[in-house]
């Protein structure tokens, strides 16, 4: 049942790099970044504390290097840098809306942004700032989905909001299979057991271990984030039962 007030006080939003790309084939669509920032600003206006993890696939994917015979570790480091670019872009969009925002990077680059620590993240959240986590986990072989689950646990998030291209988790790709059905809710174990493409195995397992729900929704629906924060909207909830 939908309420006029948010049912979460502190959340982690995971946005893929592809989401920032919009209809372009590469890079950042500023209009899309501005719209996502507007949705985050709406959540802040409701009093919700928001942390954000952004991917880097719109600029570079580390696995692309490995698939062509290159060094995976170097490729992943390049992908981490791509997430910093995206984090800075989203922070710029938020600041245009007068939303106090800080970027915390898992890779030290003090001339560009602050370095991540749990203490810093909790301090900034308590001060009402949006905290954007960049650089993934800071380690190769871990996806930004895993970074999202890790940061959610560290910041004490009540839920992970996974913004995707569709409005929830489906039995198959709804863009390819018209008979695909959307799940209203699942358990973490069901997601892992069915091999559903939500987040990678490590991310879902970490969320399960820390009893953090994962809410999958369409990041392209303007105002959808705030609507789901109040219990409405189309989504799939992954939680313990």
Curated annotation (Swiss-Prot):
A biological process term (GO) from this entry: 'de novo' CTP biosynthetic process
A GO MF annotation of the entry reads: ATP binding
Stretch list, region Involved in allosteric activation by GTP: 22-27
Q: Where in the cell is it found?
A: Cytoplasm
According to the UniProt record, what class of enzyme is this?
transferase
Binding-site positions, UMP:
56, 76, 137-144
Q: Which GO terms describe its cellular component?
A: cytosol
Coiled coil feature spans: none
Spell out the InterPro entries in the cross-references. AceGlu_kinase-like_sf, Asp/Glu/Uridylate_kinase, Uridylate_kinase, Uridylate_kinase_bac
> Looking at the Swiss-Prot or TrEMBL record, what is one Pfam family this protein matches?
AA_kinase
- Activity regulation text: Allosterically activated by GTP. Inhibited by UTP.
Stated EC number for the protein is: 2.7.4.22
Binding positions for ATP? Answer: 14-17, 57, 61, 164-165, 170, 173
Reactions performed catalytically: UMP + ATP = UDP + ADP
Kindly tell me the pathway this chain contributes to: Pyrimidine metabolism; CTP biosynthesis via de novo pathway; UDP from UMP (UMPK route): step 1/1
Q: Which UniProt keywords apply?
A: Allosteric enzyme, ATP-binding, Cytoplasm, Kinase, Nucleotide-binding, Pyrimidine biosynthesis, Transferase
**Which family would the database say this protein is a member of?**
Belongs to the UMP kinase family.
Which PANTHER family does the UniProt record give? Answer: URIDYLATE KINASE (PTHR42833), URIDYLATE KINASE PUMPKIN, CHLOROPLASTIC (PTHR42833:SF4)
**Quaternary structure?**
Homohexamer.
Please name the NCBIfam families in this protein's record. pyrH_bact (TIGR02075)
Q: What is this protein called?
A: Uridylate kinase
